[in-house]
C-alpha cells in the first residue's frame, strides 16, 4: 500500500532529497510546525510566514490585555486542526485539535500570566505557561494561520516534482488568518 506521498505519486528522489515532509497519508506524522524555525528562518517563505504569525500574536495578546472577549473568540476560531497537514498526534481523519471553547478554557489562566509577565508577546511561550496548550495545539494554530502560504508551497512542490494530476479536496478558508 502506498501510504507516503512519495510512494503515492511515484516520486523516486528519496525523502532526504525532497523539499517537503513525506507524510503518511493515513495517519499523522509526529512532527509540528515550529514557530522559532519560522521566525528565524532566512527564506522568503519563512519571512512571509513570520509576518503572519507576528500579526496574529499582536492581535491575540492585545485582545487579552484589553479584555476583548469577542475578539478572543474570533481569534480562537483559528485553533482547530487541519487534517490535511497530517502533523500531530491524530491517528486518522479526526485529529486531536483544539475547539474554540477548549481554547477559551485553556487560556483562562493567561490573564494572570500577563499580569505577572506584562512583556509576554510570543505564542511559543504559551506552550510553557498555559496548561492544556501543547506544541500540537500551537502547530494546529500555525497551520490555520499559514494555510494559504502552505497551500501555495504545496502547489509549487507538485509542479516541481512533476506530479501530473492531483485531486485536491476543496477546503474551507474560514479559519485562515
Label the predicted regions.
Residues 175-177:
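Interfaces and regulatory segments of ATP-dependent nucleotide/adenylate/phosphodiester-chemistry enzymes
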